[in-house]
Amino acid sequence: MEIIERAPAKINLGLDVLHKRVDGYHEVESIFASVDLADHLTFENLEEDIIRIETDSSFLPVDRRNHVYQAVDLLKRTYNIHKGIKIYIEKRIPVAAGLAGGSSDCAAALRGLNKLWNLGLTMDELCEIGSQIGMDVPYCLRGGTAFANGRGEKIEALPTMPQCWIVLVKPRISVSTSTVFNDLAVDELHHPDIAGLRIAIENGDYTGMTQTVGNALESVTIARHPIVQQIKDRMLKYGADAALMSGSGPTVFALCEKKTRAQRIYNGLKGFCEEVYLVRTLK
């Protein structure tokens, strides 16, 4: 038996950092949305009790560093499963891009194995397992548009964000999330209006949404990587309704109500960066 699971990318429409917690993590508020750029995972049972991860990406590890491997291993140990599995990851989401590609692959692995092995786990149980691997995994299991707080692990579903076209651009740099958080001074950050953004989304107000998107981490990443600001400026020059860095970066996205504008931005950035994608939101 072979099954296939999609693993959609996600963007941060809003991200605020409130303070550093006593446990060393930062208290955050964020609004996520799934987009139709996705990896695909194919699952196949093996007779030998091994975990085999394969992929078409040369940038992706296939050992214990891979979130998919970790998901399989955790399920096998937690539920005393003695079965072998081969998972092939068809990679379409850029690696280390701030689009939760690894977390979404992990979520797809948990969903797929729950079906393939007839585990009968509820969504809450899958989220509990996923949270042990990464804080974005519970969101990626549910997908859609959602509000997150705490360390990012507390998820509340929202209505699907107003439909629009999205241009994703990943520059040829890597950004360390831990470095960004270590560099930030919470008192000096620009704090976006997450409450206003949430209201706009709940009301289906596209204009209100574009006016309230914001990312408190942008200034920190831009200080180290000015190309992020250059991409934003180009997007706005070509007619984006809004442009924002996703997560800790380096990917930047543009929101466009009209496909013609999105296509213009796509064409204008294609020569500036290699990895440019024209996508839509997912429900």
UniProtKB/Swiss-Prot annotation:
Catalyzes the phosphorylation of the position 2 hydroxy group of 4-diphosphocytidyl-2C-methyl-D-erythritol. PANTHER family: 4-DIPHOSPHOCYTIDYL-2-C-METHYL-D-ERYTHRITOL KINASE, CHLOROPLASTIC. This is 4-diphosphocytidyl-2-C-methyl-D-erythritol kinase. HAMAP family: IspE. It catalyses: 4-CDP-2-C-methyl-D-erythritol + ATP = 4-CDP-2-C-methyl-D-erythritol 2-phosphate + ADP + H(+). One of its GO terms (molecular function) is 4-(cytidine 5'-diphospho)-2-C-methyl-D-erythritol kinase activity. Pfam families: GHMP_kinases_C, GHMP_kinases_N. Pathway: Isoprenoid biosynthesis; isopentenyl diphosphate biosynthesis via DXP pathway; isopentenyl diphosphate from 1-deoxy-D-xylulose 5-phosphate: step 3/6. Its EC number is 2.7.1.148. ATP binds at P94, V95, A96, A97, G98, L99, A100, G101, G102, S103, S104. Keywords: ATP-binding, Isoprene biosynthesis, Kinase, Nucleotide-binding, Transferase. The active site is at K10, D136. GO terms for biological process: isopentenyl diphosphate biosynthetic process, methylerythritol 4-phosphate pathway; terpenoid biosynthetic process. Belongs to the GHMP kinase family. IspE subfamily.
